[in-house]
């Protein structure tokens, strides 16, 4: 799984060298942010059901037409699948926060997502709206510390930009 540390080590090994000073600075920065990332991961894990529900509700609130016949949320089963997908992505955000890299999102969430959603007639804009709502809803210090919020928002921005 890709993280800052595994990326640095892989690059150095591929080049047949030891990690450079800038490589080690990158690892050090990643380690310094670990506490904030773990705080964000813990807060997300302890509140994930509410986060997923609010994100899904925001998605269907903004794109109400999705519940029309022939659309992605035309029945309860399909609506539940949308919430399930949001939950899946939020777990991947959690995993990414824990490891300090985008590996889980890249490997298990984003690769091919646009093509799959297009094939299934699922608009990525609805998922983007759900993740943007979740990012914008964050309120420090109510939800988490400012630095943890930055780490959390950065992970959500990564999903949003990848699906855009």
Curated annotation (Swiss-Prot):
Its main location: plastid. One of its GO terms (biological process) is photosynthesis. It is found in: Plastid, Chloroplast thylakoid membrane. It comes from the Eukaryota. The keyword Thylakoid applies. InterPro entries: Globin-like_sf, Phycobilisome_asu/bsu, Phycobilisome_asu/bsu_sf. Pfam families: Phycobilisome. It is a peripheral membrane protein. (2R,3E)-phycoerythrobilin 2 binds at residues 47, 137, 139, 142. Keywords: Antenna complex, Bile pigment, Chloroplast, Chromophore, Electron transport, Membrane, Photosynthesis, Phycobilisome, Plastid, Thylakoid, Transport. Contains two covalently linked phycoerythrobilin chromophores. The keyword Electron transport applies. (2R,3E)-phycoerythrobilin 1 binds at residues 81-82, 84, 88. GO terms for cellular component: chloroplast thylakoid membrane; phycobilisome. The light-harvesting antenna system in red algae and cyanobacteria is formed of phycobilisomes. These are composed of the phycobiliproteins phycoerythrin (CPE), phycocyanin (CPC) and allophycocyanin (APC). Cyanobacteria also contain phycoerythrocyanin (PCC). The phycobiliproteins all share the same subunit composition and organization with variations in the covalently bound open-chain tetrapyrrole chromophores. Light-harvesting photosynthetic tetrapyrrole chromophore-protein from the phycobiliprotein complex. Belongs to the phycobiliprotein family. Heterododecamer of 6 alpha and 6 beta chains. The basic functional unit of phycobiliproteins is a ring-shaped hexamer formed from two back-to-back trimers contacting via the alpha chain subunits. The trimers are composed of alpha/beta subunit heterodimers arranged around a three-fold axis of symmetry. The phycoerythrins also contain a gamma subunit which is located in the center of the hexamer. This is R-phycoerythrin alpha chain.
């Amino acid at each position: 799984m890709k993280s800052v540390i595994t990326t640095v080590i892989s690059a150095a090994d591929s080049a047949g060298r030891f990690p450079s000073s800038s490589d080690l600075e990158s690892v050090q920065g990643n380690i310094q942010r670990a506490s904030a990332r773990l705080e964000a991961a813990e807060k997300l894990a302890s509140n994930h059901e509410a986060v997923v529900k609010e994100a899904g509700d925001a998605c269907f609130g903004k794109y109400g037409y999705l519940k029309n016949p022939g659309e992605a949320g035309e029945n309860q089963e399909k609506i539940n699948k949308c919430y399930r997908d949001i939950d899946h992505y939020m777990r991947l955000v959690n995993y990414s926060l824990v490891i300090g890299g985008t590996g889980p999102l890249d490997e298990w969430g984003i690769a091919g997502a646009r093509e799959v959603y297009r094939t299934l007639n699922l608009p990525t804009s609805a998922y983007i709206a759900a993740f943007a709502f979740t990012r914008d809803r964050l309120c420090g210090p109510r939800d988490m510390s400012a630095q943890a919020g930055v780490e959390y928002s950065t992970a959500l921005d990564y999903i949003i930009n990848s699906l855009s």
